[in-house]
């Protein structure tokens, strides 16, 4: 079985993880590279938290295992996974358990200043959560800065276009190199349509 590869895109709220993930997907479709995109926040968005799972990590893992199993059965081996803390060391174990092999993990931490993150959140959080989300975002930025492993690539997002950021992040994966594209198409039974 071909080794699975995961492009982990982490970062504080408002840094652009989801938007960058979708742009990377667009660039990979153009390059005809088979892949899957999953937003980790959606895998654990339940209330209240399941009993015995206050951080919702167990339900995220169960959902990811279920979803990834379907994609893997179809031949997919590359996953773009966006989630705030996905770059932290403890996330690696989840992917190893789910993928059943030693997946190649590429960690990218998107960063933004407090001002930039708050401005982006203000455009997104139109309800009652703006103040809380902004405070949590600042806290997570410091946590990620302190605890991201040494092999994590840090990409600043302030003042840059989504296309520029996504291109830089995608380059870290090596997925668009000529050999990678050929292997992707040849070894995947189902290639997503554009």
Model-derived segments and spans:
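Hydrophobic anchor at the beta1->P-loop junction of P-loop NTPases
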Residues: 9
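Glycine-rich phosphate-binding loop used to anchor ATP phosphates in small-molecule kinases
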Residues: 59-102
């Amino acid at each position: 079985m071909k080794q699975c590869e995961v492009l982990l895109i982490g970062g504080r709220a408002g840094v652009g993880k989801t938007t960058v993930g979708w742009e990377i997907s667009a660039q990979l479709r153009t390059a005809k590279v088979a892949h899957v995109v999953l937003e980790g926040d959606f895998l654990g968005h339940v209330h209240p938290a399941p009993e015995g799972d206050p951080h919702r990590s167990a339900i995220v893992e169960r959902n990811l295992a279920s979803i990834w199993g379907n994609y893997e059965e179809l031949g997919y081996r590359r996953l773009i996974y966006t989630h705030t803390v996905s770059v932290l060391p403890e996330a690696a174990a989840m992917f190893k358990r789910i993928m059943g092999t030693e997946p190649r993990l590429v960690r990218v931490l998107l960063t933004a200043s407090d001002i930039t993150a708050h401005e982006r959140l203000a455009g997104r959080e139109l309800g009652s959560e703006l103040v809380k989300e902004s405070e949590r975002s600042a806290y997570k930025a410091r946590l990620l800065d302190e605890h991201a492993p040494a092999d994590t690539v840090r990409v600043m997002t302030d003042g840059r276009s989504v296309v520029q950021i996504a291109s830089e992040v995608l380059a870290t994966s090596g997925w668009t190199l000529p050999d990678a594209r050929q292997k992707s198409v040849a070894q995947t039974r189902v290639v997503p349509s554009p």
